[in-house]
A protein has these predicted regions:
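Transmembrane beta-barrel architecture of outer-membrane proteins
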Residues: 43, 55, 86-94, 139-145, ...
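Surface-exposed strand-loop-strand hairpins of Gram-negative outer-membrane beta-barrel proteins
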Residues: 30-36, 64-90, 125, 130-134, ...
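Short loop/turn motifs that connect adjacent beta-strands in outer-membrane beta-barrel proteins
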Residues: 31-32, 46-55, 67, 100-108, ...
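Transmembrane beta-barrel strands of outer-membrane/channel proteins
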Residues: 36, 56-66, 110-116, 163-171, ...
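Outer membrane beta-barrel transmembrane domains
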Residues: 34, 63, 77-79, 221-268
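Outer-membrane pore/translocation modules
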Residues: 106-109, 115-235
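Residues on the lipid-exposed face of transmembrane beta-strands in outer-membrane beta-barrel proteins
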Residues: 47-48, 60, 92-99, 144-150, ...
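Cleavable N-terminal export/targeting peptides
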Residues: 1-35
Length: 268
């Protein structure tokens, strides 16, 4: 059995981790899709605060991502891909259930995210390598998992600190065509636990951080538009990142601020 490991090099619903460099023949190119359920920089203000009474919450988010280059593990554009244009439009549908049960003072619940992904990709006609996308709207990988949310710490009559822990599983349940290089689904299982905290230093300021870890399991049926040797497997490396936000209340119930993330891959 041949096993190939790749480095995840981009943030988004689809991230292309390619083992091919400039010297790699087109017939040998293999792509690894980053799991479609991970949250890179999408965390909003007051991240650790939420619903603490039993019930169901539905939220929807829209994202548009565009890539104009495919990079190697050093962050350099791979020259065999000319005039790269890859676009993903994503609708994230999140369902949150808060149970009536408690543990260690926190509220127990569960969460699921169902992404709908619209993919499109094009390359120059004379590009030495042109990746094939699973075009059109398709279901991405479903993310689900339990969480424990701790009610905010109250000081001076107002909340000053809150935290939540969640253990997410990303299931390869989305649309996946092994004859296409780019798919809504990654084609493999992943686990993505995180811990999020929100600090309220003053009545008008907010700071939040979500600390994430990602472990990707082996893909025994890697997708590729070119034939692969029998028994070929792929595996994206483990990674960690932190989403962060900072905001200020400019009007009652209206905060303005910034958000971002720092991403680090630990293994290839």
């Amino acid at each position: 059995m041949k096993t190939r490991k790749f480095q995840v090099v981009s943030s988004a619903v689809l991230a292309l981790a390619l083992a091919c460099g400039a010297a790699l023949k087109p017939a040998q190119a293999v792509t690894v899709n980053e799991p479609s359920g991970i949250n890179l920089g999408g965390t909003s203000f007051f991240d650790a605060l939420g619903k603490y009474t039993p019930g169901l919450v539905y939220q929807q988010y829209f994202q548009m991502q565009h890539f104009n280059a495919i990079n190697d593990t050093n962050g350099n554009a791979i020259p065999v891909f000319k005039n790269t244009s890859i676009t993903a439009i994503v609708s994230l549908n999140q369902f949150i259930y808060v149970s009536p049960y408690h543990l260690f003072g926190g509220v127990l619940g569960a969460m699921a995210i169902v992404p709908l992904v619209d993919l499109n990709a094009s390359f120059a006609h004379d590009s030495p390598v042109r990746l094939v996308a699973n075009r059109g709207m398709g279901v991405g990988d479903i993310t689900w998992g339990p969480f424990i949310a701790f009610p905010p710490v109250i000081r001076g009559g107002r909340p000053v600190f809150a935290q939540r822990m969640e253990f997410d599983v990303i299931s390869p349940s989305g649309s996946y065509d092994t004859s296409k290089d780019i798919n809504p689904s990654s084609g493999f299982w992943s686990i993505n636990p995180y811990w999020t905290v929100t600090l309220l230093p003053t009545a008008k300021t907010e700071l939040s951080a979500r600390f994430n870890y990602l472990h990707n399991f082996t893909n025994s049926h890697p997708a590729s538009s070119a034939p692969l040797p029998a028994g070929t497997t792929t595996q994206a490396g483990d990674a960690g990142w932190v989403n962060f936000t900072a905001s200020y209340e400019v009007l009652p119930k209206l905060n303005v601020g910034l958000n971002g993330y720092y991403f680090k891959q630990f293994t290839d």
